[in-house]
């Protein structure tokens, strides 16, 4: 049987850790002047993916 392919977009966006799947919030690259300080602060921490989405991400990264 051939090797399963990893979805490279998912591999770059998500990282599997012991506590779950870590990801960085979107919308924090540029044009931040129109965003409020509160909004920028809430986007700051890396987060753990919700359990309802874990199976979808792991399917895209079979070797994670």
From Swiss-Prot:
A Pfam family annotated for this UniProt entry: Ribosomal_L35p
UniProt xrefs under SUPFAM superfamilies: L35p-like
Biological processes per GO annotation: translation
Keywords: Ribonucleoprotein, Ribosomal protein
InterPro entries linked to this entry: Ribosomal_bL35 (IPR001706), Ribosomal_bL35-like (IPR021137), Ribosomal_bL35_CS (IPR018265), Ribosomal_bL35_sf (IPR037229)
Keyword Ribonucleoprotein among UniProt keywords: yes
GO cellular component terms listed in the entry, alphabetical order: cytosolic large ribosomal subunit
MF-aspect GO terms: structural constituent of ribosome
The family this protein is said to belong to: Belongs to the bacterial ribosomal protein bL35 family.
PANTHER family per UniProt: 54S RIBOSOMAL PROTEIN BL35M, LARGE RIBOSOMAL SUBUNIT PROTEIN BL35M
Full protein name: Large ribosomal subunit protein bL35
Species of provenance: Vibrio atlanticus (strain LGP32)
């Amino acid at each position: 049987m051939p090797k399963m392919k990893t979805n490279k977009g998912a591999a770059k966006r998500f990282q599997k850790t012991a506590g779950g799947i870590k990801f960085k919030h979107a919308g924090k690259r540029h044009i931040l002047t129109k965003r409020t300080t509160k909004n920028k602060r809430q986007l700051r921490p890396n987060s753990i993916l919700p359990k309802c989405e874990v199976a979808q991400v792991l399917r895209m990264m079979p070797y994670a």
